[in-house]
Each structure stands twice: as C-alpha cells, then as structure tokens.
C-alpha cells in the first residue's frame, strides 16, 4: 500500500496540499486550459496562434506527427521544440520544460506524437484515424460540429499542462519528512 509521509511542519503540509489541488485541477481540466501560444508555420508562412481558425481545414489532415530535425555535432537529431504536424503545418516554440514532465518514460507530447497517427490495429485491421474522429466532433457527441483544429489545440494545451506542472513541482519547498 502507498505510504503517505508525515511532514515535519504545517507549512510543508499546506504547500503540498495546495500543490496537489492545483495539479489535480490542471490535469483533470486539461482540455479547457489556455493553449500555449505556439508558433504556427503553414506552407512556409507564419500564422499567429490567435488566427489558427483561419487555417484551411484541408491543410490539417494528419498522418503521423513527428519532431522536426536539426543538426547536432554533424548528426540529425530531434528538435523537441518543434513538431511537424504534416507537410503543410509545423508547430514550434515548445518550451524545453514541456519535455521535462514525464508520464512514465515519455513526455505528454511524446505520447501525442505516438497516439495521434493513422494506424491500423494489427489484431482487428481497424484503422485508427484521428482525422475521422476530429471530423465527427472529437468526442463532443452526435450533433457536434467537426473539430479540425482539435489536435493543434491539444498539443498547445498539453504544452501548457506540462509547463505548469513543472512550475508547481519546482515551487514546492524541500520536505522535512518524519519517520
């Protein structure tokens, strides 16, 4: 069973409890947090984040997300501050701290890159296509309008959640735990 340590002071308890509430709210409401203002490049032209609704939905079809590439010591390496959405759209300006919050062994953005791709299920042969899901309203119900920008916003929101999580965790005082 998990053991909840007894902290040495009330101030430590209040700090941990407040951080815990903040983290719970942040993670439970991840789809409603303010999206991180990423830099959008569409067909080589920068589009301000606030104008992402002007992007033609036909340019938002995703097949497989990936990190952009950069050269480090003469070798190709992932540029984890930039995600190639498709051949038309790139998102950049992802803070390094967004990659520091890990869910298991990967960041939240790593999980998105892995999961939001067109991919057939090996056992059933059913194709998992996030484009169809977004066209059907992204889980908002039978009468929902298509949400072609859902994944753009989700990437930005996961970035916000990851950065804020790191801020909350790093704001905690060192704990004096009683045995």
Predicted regions and their residues:
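Sequence-level detector for compositionally biased, low-complexity segments
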Residues: 1-179
